[in-house]
A protein has these predicted regions:
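Cysteine-centered iron-sulfur cluster-binding motifs in ferredoxin-type domains/subunits
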Residues: 28-35, 246, 298, 302-305
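Short capping segments at the starts of secondary-structure elements
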Residues: 376-385
Length: 416
């Protein structure tokens, strides 16, 4: 086990800060009336949560002090008992938000006054929106937004992909929101679901650069998805925030399966078998929230508290691993660049301190014996690729400037 830590302040963080999440996503169904190319859901079917199961879940959420529910799917308004579910939740005093494509909003007018907020998806101008959703729904959605706005709060969510990433598209939606006094939020495309199948793409640096331009031009908006600061230029990190999956929020699907995020494929329990509280407090989730599993690459990052290791579900791997696609890609990119190179350890003095060592050169770091042994081997002209199992550690060293590329032939000549 490698130890590579900051000196002077403790960078350890824990997400185990509340007994139960603040809100839950309730996936009412897995069907949809659109075919968005970037959708995070794949393998859609016509399954729905039963009305009895929905009531049972809502009761349990209330009994655990969870009063905020976000209805999602698929398209949640396709649920045949949607209005009945809303009426029941309203009687429990639960605050309700709908995440919808907006096509069916005119059909649920009788219960809109019981909804706290309706988040509608719009993804650019009419041409781009219809292209990305494989439909001709743009005018209908705008009409329903006007209708809904008279009854309750409306928010527009814009998911950014390579097709609608240009600043003109983003500006057009912001102008529409300003004109109608509707808040706008931007989400980045995540490498999951239909988007992954369709090989959708987002240039994260262009995305934040556009957001920065828009902010400097005076536009107000929020950013929904977490963005890891290490993947973008430092001047844009003010636009970033971490992910709340697995501690601030959770998700239950139409089969009663609990997940840390509605976009996750990893099931952590089933509400038909165990209570939400029991599932939420299982050992594996507690260990996840302790964040002791984070790699050295993240442990020494100054933005760890802000970022919290990026997206928790995108790669769909184990709970206790980095699952942010862009972060993992960045690590691999750096590793492939340095693994075949000769490196030298740029540390002038290591001071022994109990069982560990402290470097007395910038940046000051604490190493355990195993880490120091690897540093010694690297200094003995061994290439990094021989230590591939410690990739995250070596990439962290390189980013910190502890590892420097060196030409040993030149060094030998200089020593003669």
């Amino acid at each position: 086990m490698i130890k590579y830590e900051n000196v002077g302040y403790n960078q350890n963080i824990s997400l185990d800060t509340v007994d139960m999440p603040l809100y839950f996503y309730l996936e009412l169904n897995n069907s949809c009336n659109l075919r968005c190319k970037f959708c995070s859901v794949s393998n859609k079917n016509n399954e729905y949560i039963s009305i009895d199961m929905a009531r049972y879940i809502l009761d349990e959420l209330k009994n655990n002090g969870i009063y905020d529910v976000y209805y999602t799917g698929g398209e949640p308004l396709l649920h045949p008992n949607f209005m009945e579910i809303v009426e029941y939740a309203d009687k429990l005093g639960i605050r309700q938000t709908i995440l919808t494509n907006g096509i069916l909003l005119d059909k649920i007018q009788p219960v809109l006054n019981k909804i706290m907020c309706v988040c509608v998806s719009i993804h650019g101008t009419k041409e781009i929106h219809n292209k990305l959703t494989d439909s001709n729904c743009y005018d209908k959605v705008l009409s329903n937004i006007e209708l809904t706005k008279k009854i309750t709060n409306v928010k527009i969510n814009y998911t950014v992909t390579s097709d609608n990433q240009n600043i003109k598209e983003m500006k057009d939606v912001l102008e529409f929101g300003n004109k109608k006094n509707i808040p706008i939020s931007f989400s980045k495309y995540n490498n999951i679901g239909e988007g992954k199948k369709n090989k959708c793409y987002i240039n994260i640096n262009s995305f934040v650069e556009n957001l920065n331009i828009l902010r400097n031009e005076g536009y107000n908006f929020s950013v929904n998805d977490c963005i890891a600061p290490c993947t973008i230029e430092e001047k844009y990190t003010y636009l970033t925030h971490g992910c709340g999956a697995g501690y601030l929020f959770g998700s239950i699907d139409y089969n009663g399966n609990l997940k840390i995020c509605p976009s996750s494929k990893r099931i952590i329990g089933n509400n038909k078998v165990n209570s939400i509280k029991k599932i939420w407090n299982q050992t594996s989730l507690k260990n996840f929230r302790k964040m002791e599993w984070i790699p050295e690459y993240c442990k020494v990052c100054k933005n760890l508290a802000r970022c919290r290791c990026g997206c928790k579900i995108e790669l769909g791997e184990k709970l206790n691993e980095i699952n942010d696609y862009i972060v993992k890609t960045e690590i691999e990119k750096i590793w492939n660049r340095i693994k075949k190179k000769n490196m030298k350890v740029n540390i002038s003095v290591l001071r022994k301190e109990k069982k560990d060592y402290v470097s007395l050169s910038y940046p000051s770091r604490k190493y355990n014996v195993e880490a120091v042994k690897i540093l010694e081997k690297i200094n003995n002209e061994q290439r990094l690729e021989q230590f591939a199992e410690y990739k995250d550690f070596l990439v962290a060293l390189y980013k910190d400037g502890v590892l420097k590329e060196v030409d040993y032939n030149v060094e030998k000549e200089n020593r003669r």
